[in-house]
Amino acid sequence: MHFYIPPPPISGFWLGPLYVHMYSVFMLAGALVLFELTNRRFIVLTGNREFTAFAVTSLLIPVILGARLWHVVSHTQMYEHQPFYKVFAIWQGGLGFIGGVFSGLICFFVIAKIKKVPPFTFLDALAPGILVALCFARLGNYFNGEVFGTETTLPWGLKLSHEGFKDLNVEKYFHPIFLYEIILNVFIIVILLVLEKRVFVKTVFPKGSVFAAFLVLYGLGRFALEPMRYNLQQNSFGLDLNYVGAAAMIIVGVLIACRHTIASGKLRNSGD
């Protein structure tokens, strides 16, 4: 007998005249958990009780736009022959996490400067919450029939429904990449909390080290998972942007972790 992960039983439900997608339910739940975790952590670190709400509400639209843009650019062939409004149909899925990270990061530094808040302290408070929210989002991907991999004979393979997968042999089983990434995210959260409690507080590490570790570890994890991921559509550039994005996350993480060393080196050079 072959055990497998069944197709999602539903994709949404009716709430009066409104059809609510399960994807949006999990996205909303993830956003609420992210806010609560980040707010509590930032209050402990700084005593500031107002900034988290301001930051989350201010960054919501830039993050969604960046995530959607990343998805569309990564899958241009999917939208070439579709009505233009499909580009904006985020309720059907299609948000690129990596794009959301970078668009949010850029906008965050702007508002942190305006509000005169220590940016890297907030990013340290934010990092675990991002991963928890992403776990919720990946559950939403399951209900949307997204983020699965290539065919597999492993006993935890994902069974796809017949709807929406005409180009695939739905009698086969596929790697549940969404589940792999949930496990990866939980693993990274544990590492971040251990580093924060047992390493970063006992040694001289700059603020932002937790966030830097998140970027590096997640980037490495995406590199490991990406070869198993099934891409229904490719972009028109012949380039897998997820590899580029994962590499960029690693590089930015290393730069954040090493910024004090880089800055001190510049100061020494300027004095020569």
UniProtKB/Swiss-Prot annotation:
Family matches, as InterPro entries: Lgt
Localization per Swiss-Prot or TrEMBL: Cell membrane
Protein's UniProt name: Phosphatidylglycerol--prolipoprotein diacylglyceryl transferase
Source species of the chain: Tropheryma whipplei (strain TW08/27)
Keyword Transferase belongs to the record: yes
Cellular-component GO terms for this entry: plasma membrane
Membrane topology: Multi-pass membrane protein
Top EC class for this record: transferase
Pfam family, one: LGT
Top-rank taxon: Bacteria
Family per record: Belongs to the Lgt family.
Known role: Catalyzes the transfer of the diacylglyceryl group from phosphatidylglycerol to the sulfhydryl group of the N-terminal cysteine of a prolipoprotein, the first step in the formation of mature lipoproteins.
Annotated GO MF terms: phosphatidylglycerol-prolipoprotein diacylglyceryl transferase activity
Recorded name of the encoding gene: lgt
Positions contributing to a 1,2-diacyl-sn-glycero-3-phospho-(1'-sn-glycerol) binding: 138
E.C. no: 2.5.1.145
